[in-house]
Amino acid sequence: MKWSEMASVNATQQHLNFSSSWEEDSSDNSFDEWTHKSVPLRSPCRTPRIQRHRNRSITVSPSVPTSPIPYAAWKKLRLCDSPSTPKSLLSKSTMPCSSSKTCRSQRFLRLSTAFERVPSVNINPFTPDTVRRNSEHYKRKSQRSDDDEDYGPRSKEIQNSSEDESFFLPSKRPAVSARMLSRYESEFLELACIGVGEFGSVYRCVKRLDGCMYAIKRSRRPIAGSANEQLALKEVYAHAVLGHHPHVVRYYSAWAEDDHMIIQNEYCDGGSLHDAITEKREQGEFFSVPELRDLLLQVSMGLKYIHNSGLVHLDIKPSNIFICRRSTLSAGGEGDSEEEDESHSSGVVYKIGDLGHVTSISSPQVEEGDSRFLAYEVLREDYTHLPKADIFALGLTVLLAAGASPLPQNGDDWHRLRQGELPNLPHELPALFKDLLKSLLDPDPTARPSATALCRHDVLCKERAGKLATQLRKELNVEKFRTAMLERELKEARLAATSPQQSCQPGSLPKAKRKLVGRNVARSVSFGFPGY
């Protein structure tokens, strides 16, 4: 090695020794304190000290050049395995605040970004206000710390900034991987296509795990970013909020595959009311008056539950009312009342489905449904009495089941129905029931009965009262039979209790016989203990 190269190495080592010594002097001080204080810098040309050991002799060959810095001085430079590298120093210089201030700013940053970041879950717009307020109060309580003195001013600033923004943040779209297994194909066995609509198709499937039948609705086209995306999300939101009710189609789960929405619902083995009306019309038949009363009563119960939940359906029609042929009792769902606790003797249960047009009563975002069942006030964008629009559509649905001709989409006949005129029917209805249907089609929405009033109407309660009387008579006969059986058992027990006292006189007891327990072991029949 030449002496010029050795000089350059020596200068480099001196510069590195300067960086290391500055790190030792300023490692305990923050960058902001260093900027306000003048730190005396050592001379960059100072040669590093060399510690020589007396007991060590260093022999230097005159022909072979060696490093001017021994091993001990080289280790003192702290260039090996040192965390204080130039990169770490640079990262420290980019943070102008002290350690205590950094922790506070980081806590504020985490708190503010928690409100500003895009949510990882969807926000259900149909969630009741009480549940939403409780969740926000719990979130604020969990974010506050006992030793955080600046929480009050920060929370006010965050609250003011969050109120300016829209409450409903963008919906979360699930990431779909090409290697992801299809849940629909792995968990369900498709049997048949039972319906095709504007949104997509409905399939009758068997779940491989539990062996039960379900109705799986799948969107026809990818809905991500399309107009149908909001309709699909509305249906999922409404089903999730409503829960389980005997007159609303039950919801189980929903997921997305390849940007297609898939909804797992309850399977109704009787098909839709539209199918039943079409089948009867082809056979020259129509629904009888008791069947019409049962239809009107059960759908009114479902609408009552939906309206009491703060929602409106806005798409009531025969194709969205489904039939279960099996005989079921009222399952005690949420919102049940005394008029719902009945057994359907006909074995037919009507359920409201297809909640794609559901919206909130307090803050409506109306998507107009089928124009044949649309109330006139909704067409005029008067949303002050939205639940009465469902009542109007229910009246037209009952008229179709009674044998009315298909409803017009526009024209004079369409306007005559909105004026409260009933269409011609193939058979005469009772006067009271006919007046009830006229009230459902009243041009004034305030004059139409509510779903709760329909459930208690005298015309519908008479039919229900007859069913209840028959059921009560059956239950009374069963209770009479049980009472007779209990009386007979009680009489026999009394006779058995008095007979030993009459037959057993003093001195008339038979002699006790000896019984063998085991081998050659005698034991008395009496099991009394001495002293008792």
Swiss-Prot record:
Oocyte-specific protein tyrosine kinase that phosphorylates and inhibits cdk1 and acts as a key regulator of meiosis. Required to maintain meiotic arrest in oocytes by phosphorylating cdk1 at 'Tyr-15', leading to inhibit cdk1 activity and prevent meiotic reentry. Its EC number is 2.7.10.2. It is an enzyme of class 2 (transferase). The lineage of its organism: Eukaryota, Metazoa, Chordata, Craniata, Vertebrata. This is Wee1-like protein kinase 2. It comes from Danio rerio. One of its GO terms (biological process) is mitotic cell cycle. Gene3D superfamilies: Phosphorylase Kinase, domain 1, Transferase(Phosphotransferase) domain 1. One of its GO terms (cellular component) is nucleus. The gene is wee2. The active site is at residue 315. ATP binds at residues 194-202, 217. Pfam families: Pkinase. Residues 123-166 are annotated as: Disordered. It is found in: Nucleus. Mg(2+) binds at residues 320, 354. Its main location: nucleus. It catalyses: L-tyrosyl-[protein] + ATP = O-phospho-L-tyrosyl-[protein] + ADP + H(+). The keyword Magnesium applies. Residues 469-495 form a coiled coil. GO terms for molecular function: ATP binding; magnesium ion binding; non-membrane spanning protein tyrosine kinase activity; protein tyrosine kinase activity. Belongs to the protein kinase superfamily. Ser/Thr protein kinase family. WEE1 subfamily. Residues 188-465 form the Protein kinase domain. The keyword Magnesium applies. PANTHER family: EUKARYOTIC TRANSLATION INITIATION FACTOR 2-ALPHA KINASE EIF2-ALPHA KINASE -RELATED, WEE1-LIKE PROTEIN KINASE 2. Transmembrane segments: none annotated. Keywords: ATP-binding, Coiled coil, Kinase, Magnesium, Meiosis, Metal-binding, Nucleotide-binding, Nucleus, Transferase, Tyrosine-protein kinase. Signal peptide: none annotated.
